[in-house]
């Protein structure tokens, strides 16, 4: 019966996941239908605008060239008409002079003939006909205004839609996730020398499968990539996966996005559990600050809260959500998990296997600071490193500066400069807890033991503050040092 019930649960889970997948695909199809309508309308409007622009250019060219013909015709007509008028006047003058000469010649016996002949001779000398050029000032040839648009017509007939680059193909085998960096490699399915650049988009997600259309996280965009690979650096992996897609662009248009891919981004992500903190510690997500008045203020707030009563969380609020299997449930509201001189706060996520890494930066002026791990059984009054349930590195700046490793009330003084940022690497199954200078990755100390219970990140501070960085992968340099045995074995013999 139990097996059938379990099998039915699996079927229900499978069907629910499949239904969600189909619903997401239906939503995608509906969105694509809307996009087809909107995009086709847009490209149609763009096409009409481009042709209208061509028509306008052709019309402007036509008007300009017609104006040139009209101006040339008017100029030549003016010159020829002026020349024609001058020739007509010269001809009339010449004909009058010819008639006078004929008449004078017929009256040779008259006494005034010599004088008349002399006047005719002088008139011929001054006649316009003999000063007139009989060559046309302009030509009637208009061949310089002829056109032949055969080549342009062929170009217009060759008009077509812009060539769109193919969608790239992301090469998962060559892509890499390491050191909180992602190197994405892709290739083009065919050779295209006209590609100008690529556009890469990525987003975070907690879903392993194909990227879903509905996501809370927006796509982040990186433009102007010239190579077929790109490395994203300095990422914080606060979700389990990342989606990636890339498209190619020429100087005119962008192609389709590649098939999106999902890469796992394993990292240790936790928050500081304010319900576990000492009342003198003011906790804000991943930051902690010592507050000398914290206890008194807390007592006042508690009394006010008791007087007003409590309000239940809404049914659908996160407060009623199912916690992660490794996420610790919230503790008591009175913030008395640690008290007296145990100025401690714990992380909210259990470590029960695998390798994990996180970093913490503390205020150098803090009088005391400690970082490490602890079992959940760590007592209210117990300080980090003073019982068998906790391991830590401790910095003391009060009265006398000391830098020590502590476990089970045993102390080892560390001969190393105190960094302002510490890296913590926990390999649960190997029983290794190593501390590093977060900047140089120099090993400061390594505990070698056998963890018998799940662990929690643990911190302590007195008269100071610190900031935790999570969502980090185990650095490659740390893995390399561990494999090469760089962590000194002799430093652990007194602290196991």
UniProtKB/Swiss-Prot annotation:
The UniProt record lists the keyword NADP: no
CDD domains listed in its UniProt record: FN3 (cd00063), SPRY_PRY_FSD1 (cd12901)
Gene Ontology molecular function terms on file: microtubule binding
Written domain comment of the UniProt record: B30.2 box contains a microtubule-binding site.
Organism: Macaca fascicularis (Crab-eating macaque)
Domain called Fibronectin type-III: residue spans: 164-268
Coiled coil: 4-99
Protein name listed in UniProt: Fibronectin type III and SPRY domain-containing protein 1
The organism's place on the tree of life at top rank: Eukaryota
Main location: cytoplasm
């Amino acid at each position: 019966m139990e097996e059938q019930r379990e099998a039915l649960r699996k079927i229900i889970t499978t069907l629910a996941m499949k239904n969600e997948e189909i619903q997401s695909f239906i939503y995608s199809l509906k969105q694509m239908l809307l996009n087809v309508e909107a995009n086709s309308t847009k490209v149609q409007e763009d096409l009409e605008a481009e042709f209208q622009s061509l028509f306008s250019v052709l019309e402007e060219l036509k008007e300009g060239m017609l104006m040139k013909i009209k101006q040339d015709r008017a100029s030549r007509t003016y010159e020829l008409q002026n020349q024609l008028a001058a020739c007509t006047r010269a001809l009339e003058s010449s004909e009058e002079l010819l008639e006078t000469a004929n008449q004078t010649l017929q009256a040779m016996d008259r006494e005034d003939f010599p004088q008349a002949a002399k006047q005719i001779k002088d008139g011929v000398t001054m006649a316009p006909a003999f000063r007139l050029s009989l060559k046309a000032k302009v030509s009637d040839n208009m061949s310089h205004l002829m056109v032949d648009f055969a080549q342009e017509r062929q170009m217009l007939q060759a008009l077509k839609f812009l060539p769109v680059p193919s969608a790239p193909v992301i090469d998962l085998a060559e892509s890499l996730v390491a050191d909180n960096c992602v190197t994405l490699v892709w290739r083009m399915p065919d050779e295209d020398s006209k590609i100008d650049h690529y556009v890469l988009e990525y987003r975070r997600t907690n879903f392993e499968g194909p990227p879903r259309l509905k996501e809370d996280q927006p796509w982040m965009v990186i433009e102007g990539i010239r190579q077929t690979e790109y490395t994203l650096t300095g990422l914080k992996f606060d979700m389990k996966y990342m989606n990636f897609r890339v498209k190619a662009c020429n100087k005119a248009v962008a192609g389709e996005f590649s098939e999106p891919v999902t890469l796992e981004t394993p990292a240790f992500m936790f928050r500081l559990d304010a319900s576990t903190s000492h009342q003198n510690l003011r906790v804000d997500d991943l930051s902690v600050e010592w507050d000398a008045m914290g206890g008194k203020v807390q007592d006042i707030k508690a009394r006010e809260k008791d007087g007003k009563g409590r309000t239940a969380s809404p049914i659908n609020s996160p407060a009623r959500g199912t916690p992660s299997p490794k996420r610790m449930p919230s503790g008591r509201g009175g913030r008395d998990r640690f008290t007296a001189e145990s100025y401690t706060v714990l992380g909210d996520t259990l470590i029960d296997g695998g390798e994990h890494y996180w970093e913490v930066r503390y205020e150098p002026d803090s009088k005391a600071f400690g970082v490490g791990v602890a079992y959940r059984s760590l007592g209210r009054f117990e300080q980090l490193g003073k019982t068998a349930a906790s391991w830590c590195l401790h910095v003391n700046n009060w009265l006398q500066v000391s830098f020590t490793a502590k476990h089970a009330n045993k102390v080892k003084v560390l001969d190393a400069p105190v960094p302002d940022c510490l890296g913590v690497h926990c390999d649960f199954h190997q029983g290794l807890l190593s501390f590093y200078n977060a900047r140089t990755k120099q090993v400061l100390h390594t505990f070698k033991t056998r963890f018998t219970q799940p662990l929690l990140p643990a911190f302590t501070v007195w008269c100071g503050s610190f900031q935790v960085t999570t969502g980090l992968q185990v650095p490659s340099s740390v893995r390399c040092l561990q494999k090469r045995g760089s962590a000194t074995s002799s430093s652990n013999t007194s602290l196991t």
